[in-house]
């Protein structure tokens, strides 16, 4: 199981993640996500090569966005300076992202459903990486896990985004690749409705 959020905390990556979080609109988020795409693709290529044909389950972004932003004023001021935005904007966004119950809040598939461009970027990175590695003669078995699904509609919505994005990549490259999409039953609602999921 590859938890993709751990890839986001290093150097330039955390900066791009924070740019995405602080973006005012989808266009701004897409600009930041475009910076993350080659980093994610490279990570997945390394992973698929190392696994030498063994199945790899890649879990899409799971934690709430507040985990990626600084919570103390000093660090928020440093971030504001680094990003050339007013400190007040950073402080307001951090306050807006605060979760009462971060274990069940705006995270997992709900984050991907609110911001489908995140799911699109991660799917593109996974599929492109798998196809690149496959071209070298190494078999690749990709399993994409949608996190924190509570009902079948959430999974269906995310699967549609994943499938549409994969089809775009297949069309661009005039090649195809088998992959699976699934979830983990990890919340009570998912257990109760598992027969639908």
Predicted regions and their residues:
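Conserved alpha/beta-domain cores
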Residues: 1-197
């Amino acid at each position: 199981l590859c938890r993709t959020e751990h890839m986001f905390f290093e150097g330039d990556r955390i900066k791009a993640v924070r740019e995405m979080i602080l973006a005012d609109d989808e266009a701004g988020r897409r600009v930041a996500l475009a910076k993350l795409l080659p980093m994610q693709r490279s990570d997945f290529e390394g992973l698929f090569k190392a696994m030498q044909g063994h199945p790899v389950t890649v879990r899409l972004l799971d934690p709430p966005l507040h985990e990626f932003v600084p919570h103390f004023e000093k660090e928020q001021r440093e971030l504001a300076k680094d990003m050339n935005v007013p400190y007040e904007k950073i402080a307001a966004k951090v306050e807006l992202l605060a979760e009462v119950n971060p274990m069940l809040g705006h995270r997992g598939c709900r984050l991907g459903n609110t911001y489908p461009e995140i799911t699109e970027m991660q799917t593109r990175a996974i599929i492109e990486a798998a196809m690149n590695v496959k071209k070298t003669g190494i078999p690749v078995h990709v399993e994409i896990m949608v996190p924190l699904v509570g009902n079948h509609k959430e999974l269906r919505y995310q699967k549609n985004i994943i499938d549409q994005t994969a089809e775009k990549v297949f069309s661009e490259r005039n090649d195809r690749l088998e992959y699976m999409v699934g979830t983990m039953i990890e919340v009570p609602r998912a257990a109760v409705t598992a027969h639908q999921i």
